[in-house]
């Protein structure tokens, strides 16, 4: 996979150029919210340890740009997502809201719930929902397996668990015809094999991602229920 060259300049310039590289339109208001989100994450991180990444430049690339890279693939992969219809989305093991907060900023018609078992992380997401004016963003301080089935169009995770564990814990929150989507680094062949052997969910496709300024392999794993499993 070819890497996108590093982007010079300050955060605002780098963000604008990253959106251009991703062919992802972002108006001035959205860009301002994205930058405020990362700034607040840096501030909270000093006290609450939201993420192991401390460097502002690395946060911009490894958190913000990485999350932005899935917006267009989700729109292409979910017919309702690009039509303007409401989309119900769970972000499982969201931490400080990645990618959920970014998705809520970029798509106001996506109703995003960030689910995490660590209270300080969901408190941060709630703070961002208010501070950034995101009525389509909520946070749930709980384990995903403790929630009642949510009938989501899509449930997404980023560095949450193996594919089999993700499907086992979160699959019941996907409505009939919906999908599970896992953000991964290298294609996890062993995880895919374990998932397929389990039988309830199957990998529909593997979609490569190119994250601006990140020289690393990234992909999306799209999963659907196997026929006969509801």
Curated annotation (Swiss-Prot):
Keyword Transferase assigned: yes
Protein's UniProt keywords contain Transmembrane helix: no
InterPro entries registered for this protein in UniProt: rRNA_ssu_MeTfrase_G, SAM-dependent_MTases_sf
Alphabetical UniProt keywords: Cytoplasm, Methyltransferase, rRNA processing, S-adenosyl-L-methionine, Transferase
Compartments in which it is found: Cytoplasm
EC id: 2.1.1.170
Binding residues for S-adenosyl-L-methionine: 93, 98, 144-145, 158
UniProt catalytic activity: guanosine(527) in 16S rRNA + S-adenosyl-L-methionine = N(7)-methylguanosine(527) in 16S rRNA + S-adenosyl-L-homocysteine
Coiled-coil regions listed: none
Molecular-function annotations in GO: rRNA (guanine-N7-)-methyltransferase activity
Enzyme class: transferase
Predominant subcellular localization, coarse grouping: cytoplasm
Gene Ontology terms: cellular component: cytosol
SUPFAM superfamilies associated with the record: S-adenosyl-L-methionine-dependent methyltransferases
A UniProt-annotated Pfam family: GidB
Cited function: Specifically methylates the N7 position of guanine in position 527 of 16S rRNA.
Family: Belongs to the methyltransferase superfamily. RNA methyltransferase RsmG family.
Alphabetical list of HAMAP family matching this protein: 16SrRNA_methyltr_G
Record protein name field: Ribosomal RNA small subunit methyltransferase G
Organism, scientific name: Bordetella pertussis (strain Tohama I / ATCC BAA-589 / NCTC 13251)
Gene that encodes it: rsmG
